[in-house]
Amino acid sequence: MHDPFYDIFPRPPEPVWRTGEMALITIDMQYMDAHPDGWMGRAAGAVGKRDVLTQRYEAIARALPRIRQLQDAFRAHGEQVLHARIAFRTDDGREAGRAFMPSPHEQSIARDERDDEILSEVAPVGDELVFSKTSSSVFSTTDIERVLWNLGVRHLVFTGLVTDGCVELSARDAADRGFRVTLVEDATCSSTPEAHEDAIARMTDGGFIVAKSTEETLELLESMSRALTPAGVGDAA
C-alpha cells in the first residue's frame, strides 16, 4: 500500500553504481532455514506442518541460481561478496534477543551442526566475509557497519531470505546508516508470494531502497564496469 506522504516530495534519484564501492550480501541462505532438512523443516515436521513451508522452499529453489549468478558476476568484477547467517554460540540460543529466543517447544528440536552452514550453491569462496548474527538485522549483532566502511563499501545489494524479515530489516538499517541500497527482488524470497511482494512494495515505496531484477542488476554491473558509473543515473547518496 502506498503512503501518500511520499507524494509531497520528488522521488529520490536512483543510486549510482561505482566500482570499488559495491557489495553483494546474501542473508540467511543456510541449512537452518533454507533447506527442508534444516532446523526449521525439522521443527515443522515435529508438529506435522511441513506443508506450511512448501512455498518457502520452492521460492528458495528459484532464487538460488540467481544468487549464484550474481555472486559470480560480482566476483568477476572485483566487487565484495558478503554473507550473513544466523548462528548461536550456545546450544539453546540464550544469547539471542527475545525475538530470536527459541520457545520451549522449539528448544526440544535438536540442532544440527549443519544448520549454521550456508547452502553449498551459494557458499563463500576463499576468504569472503561471513557475518554471524543473533538478530533479524545483520547490523544489530555484528560489526558489519565498521567492516563495510573499512572496505570502502557504500552501496549494498541484497539477496536472500526472508524478504519480509531479515532482508527487510537489514536493508532498512543499511539505508538508515547512509548506505545506498538495492534489493534484487527475484533473488530474495519469503514463505509466501504475498509476504514477499508486500515487503518489496513497503521497502521501495519512498524510493530510498531500489528494487531490481537479477537481469537488471547484472546489466548495471556491466554498465558500471564499462563506464565507471552508469550513464544518466543520479546519485541518491
Describe every region a protein language model picked out.
Residues 1-23, 36-44, 69-77, 88-89, ...:
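Active-site-adjacent betaalpha module
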Residues 59-61, 71, 75, 81:
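Domain-level signal for Mg2+-assisted phosphodiester chemistry and nucleotide/NA-binding surfaces
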Residues 48-65, 104-113:
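A short acidic, glycine-rich active-site loop
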Residues 25-27:
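Short hydrophobic beta-strand that contains or immediately precedes a catalytic carboxylate
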Residues 83-87, 91:
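Catalytic-core segment of enzymes that process non-peptidic bonds
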